[in-house]
Amino acid sequence: MRSDKSRKRFVFLCVAPATILFFIFMILPTLNVFRMSLYERGAYSPNETFVGLKNFQHLLKDTQFIRSMQNMILLVVTVTLITFAFALVFAAILTREKIKGQNFFRIIFYIPNILSVVVISGIFSAIYKPENGMLNSIIGLFRSMSDPILWKGEKLVIPSIIIAMVWQAIGYYMVMYMASMSAVPISLYESANLDGAGRLTQFFQITIPLIWTNIRTTLTFFIISTINMAFLFVKAMTSGGPNGASDVALSYMYSQKDAGLYGYSMAIGVVIFLFSFALSACVNKVTNRDTLEF
């Protein structure tokens, strides 16, 4: 009895500091964001005026905010689908096929993940340069270009950011899936071969179901982190330009804060928070399956 109480006390003492810090630095600031979204406050004035839902009503009429949300959703969906498709395919190839230098390819694919967003943005900004960028130079070898392609112009800026984000993320998830695929017993594939199942059938009927728990976990994590990564790439590569064409919700929130619209920027933050929470819940619901064991 005494040992049981001592154990509970020990667990409480271990958990309490982390819980207190989480409450102070996560819960309280989040609640304060919700509170500030209901007020109007100037940049240099400590006075706050309660406006209720006025900031949220303004959001519905703000075309630039709607555009930034559309950009964010486009980036989240596109980057997630492309990254996970390539990560799974590359992981399957490097795990199942007898390719020399597997560790070398792991390192090569993983390197972009350890680079900072600023470095990656600098690399791709140099590649996308209209005058002497690598991409336009390569295209110029095959056809004459009277006017250089503006990869960071209004029409192509979002696809250009998508490419940079996919390049940065793909290696990390490939390595994670390789670890999961390596744990799948070879005997399952051998039995499938005897039954006449091809590699594609084995991939969808054996590999994917058996590593689905890992896919589901990483998918939820990646979708939420992409919302933040999209902001970092936009901030580093374009600062929301040109003419707000690459603005995402977070970058637009910061621009409103810099303009002194604190309450309005907090309202944008609340919308992003609720969107992230709802998206996570939807992903968990849609990807929920019975766990298969081997």
PLM-predicted stretches and their roles:
Residues 2-294:
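A structural signal for multi-pass alpha-helical bundles of membrane permease subunits
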